[in-house]
UniProtKB/Swiss-Prot annotation:
InterPro entries the UniProt entry points to: Ribosome_recyc_fac, Ribosome_recyc_fac_dom, RRF_sf
Function: Responsible for the release of ribosomes from messenger RNA at the termination of protein biosynthesis. May increase the efficiency of translation by recycling ribosomes from one round of translation to another.
Entry GO MF terms: ribosomal large subunit binding
Recorded family membership: Belongs to the RRF family.
Alphabetized UniProt keyword annotations: Cytoplasm, Protein biosynthesis
Entry keyword annotation includes Membrane: no
Gene, per the UniProt record: frr
Superkingdom of origin: Bacteria
Compartments, record wording: Cytoplasm
Biological processes, Gene Ontology terms: translational termination
GO cellular component, one term: cytoplasm
The protein's name: Ribosome-recycling factor
Protein species of origin: Listeria innocua serovar 6a (strain ATCC BAA-680 / CLIP 11262)
Main location: cytoplasm
Pfam families linked: RRF (PF01765)
Length: 185
């Protein structure tokens, strides 16, 4: 039962790390990356459809995204969605594909993005700490019910803390890598 609490906690902490990685992937770092368009949706036959499901997105150059829609009639809609988005990018439409040039980031914008990265990282750390708290509460319930001894409670509590420390270390590493990517000129 207590091993179950540990494995569930570990799984939840890994999910928090993965969510952070996905979230940071959508932050523009001055380099072309197909995940920039992950949150972008287009109204396609009455349904909000993600662009990455209706077009091929490739990175031909370091600062260029090439969007090739499977259905050429939707090209204008994708262009409008990009212009309306908060990406700050202007697509170049040549009738069959869209080209997105990724401009260099200004120093001020880099600092804003680093703040955003730190905020996302802090939210992930809070999620991990909440998972730790839930695990400790579950272990205390097991001890109260007589399923585990007080010594087991202490031992499993230390294991939960080790998982938490490891997860926070991973989050710090992910954050540091993203900050370095953003600050790279």
């Amino acid at each position: 039962m207590s091993k179950e609490v540990l494995s569930k906690s570990k799984e939840k902490m890994e999910k928090a790390e993965q969510a952070l990685t996905r979230q940071l992937g959508t932050i523009r770092a001055g380099r072309a990356n197909a995940s920039l368009l992950d949150r972008l949706t287009v109204d396609y036959y009455g349904a909000a459809t993600p662009v990455n499901q209706m077009a091929s997105i490739s990175v031909p150059e370091a600062r260029m995204l090439l969007i090739t829609p499977y259905d050429k009639t939707i090209l204008g809609e994708i262009e409008k969605a990009i212009l309306k988005s908060d990406l700050g990018l202007t697509p170049n439409n040549d009738g069959s594909v869209l080209r997105l040039s990724i401009p260099q980031l200004t120093e001020e914008r880099r600092k804003e993005l680093v703040k955003e990265v730190k905020k996302e990282a802090e939210e992930a750390k809070v999620a991990v700490r909440n998972i730790r708290r839930e695990a400790n509460e579950d272990l205390k319930k097991l001890e109260k019910n007589g399923d585990i001894t007080e010594d087991d409670l202490r031992s499993y509590g230390e294991d939960v803390q080790k998982l938490t420390d490891e997860s926070i270390k991973n989050i710090d590493s992910i954050t540091k890598d993203k900050e370095a990517e953003i600050l790279e000129v």
